[in-house]
Amino acid sequence: MKTKHILMATALASLSLMTTSCGSDFLDKAPSGNYTAPTFYSSDKAVMKGVEPLYNKAWFNFNRRALIGMGSFRANDGWNPYVSAEFANFKVTALTEDLSLAWSALYNVVTMSNATLANLEQYCTNDVTPSVKNAAEGECYLMRGWAYFYLLRGWGDNILFEDNNKLVQNPNQPLNTEADVLKFIIRDFRKAEQLLPETGTDHHASKYAAKAALAKALLAQSGWEEGSTTDHQRNEATLQEVKNLCDEVINSGQYSLMNNYEDLFKAQNNDNSETVLAMRWADPNSGEWGAMNATYSDLAFPEVTDVNVWGGNLSPSCDMLDYYNEDPADSIRRNATWFTPNTYYSYIKKSDGGYTY
């Protein structure tokens, strides 16, 4: 019995020490080694860095594999019997992993955009230049709009939300109609256009990236909106706005077509005159998983890279090759987009003098 009393007394003593140690001063410790929202947004540089995950990590599980399957494979440009084959074979179901990863990634972009907008509004100090804050907010609206644009075209009706906290408190939200989702997208792109600068810096978007996105969304709306079209005719007023926006982008002086189509795919032209808006990924050899571009794994094959890849079974579709072969001059595009037998590529394995497939 004495032993039990001693053990109980020791336990109670320990509990009292634990209880008295947990005062408010003990709990209110500033994290060491990590940034926190209340103190992070204190300079122009920090604000610009704060939106950069919207150019990579937020999109990772959409860009990694689903984008190719939902895009090129479903469009019958090509296919791989071992990777995302169900998109080419029209066997996609609600349980298809790439599809669910894409859906969650796109909503990740939405929630990250919402959180960044809230942080910018709440925590930006007076040391942040108003134009820099506006640009960062514009990027959030632009990325959220693009995420919803992909969600709309992939899933139709979707859940719209701008406040993450409200969604957490009440996660049971109704679906919004396609027409309403498209209106939301267009509203976001218009806000982005108003807030973004004339010229982007350090790979950040300019207002012309928003104008281009807005033109694309309005083009969709011109034939989508109920009551505005009859007999499959598009809304002419909307089409005129699309034309005006495209003219503004083209005549901005910031973009131009490259002379050689093949040059688009060369590493040294990663940022070129045709780039309006692009994701920004870390080096696949040294970058953090989730912040680097992992599409190379599915698209490349071991013979042409020192990175771990498995794209050797990727092939163009017969229809794709037929389109290229209709015009012999189109071998320029064919050779640039697909490795063609007996074709020499001077920009592949340059240290070895090039590569012949």
Residue positions per predicted region:
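Bacterial Sec-dependent N-terminal signal peptides
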Residues: M1-S32
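Secondary-structure transition into beta-strands, especially the periplasmic turns and strand N-termini
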Residues: H5, M18-S21, C124-Y141, Q240-E248
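An aromatic- and glycine-enriched ligand-binding surface/loop that stacks and positions planar moieties
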Residues: C22-S84, R190-K191, H204-Y357
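Flexible, solvent-exposed coil segments and beta strand-coil junctions
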Residues: S32, V92-T93, N165-L167
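Conserved, well-structured interaction surfaces
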Residues: Y41-N63, W79-W155, N170-K183, R187-D202
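A short secondary-structure junction motif
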Residues: L120-Y123, G154-F161, A192, Q221, ...
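Short coil/linker segments at helix-helix boundaries
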Residues: D157-A179, W224-K243
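Glycine- and aromatic-rich loop/turn segments at beta-sheet edges
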Residues: I159-N164, L195-H203, S256-E262
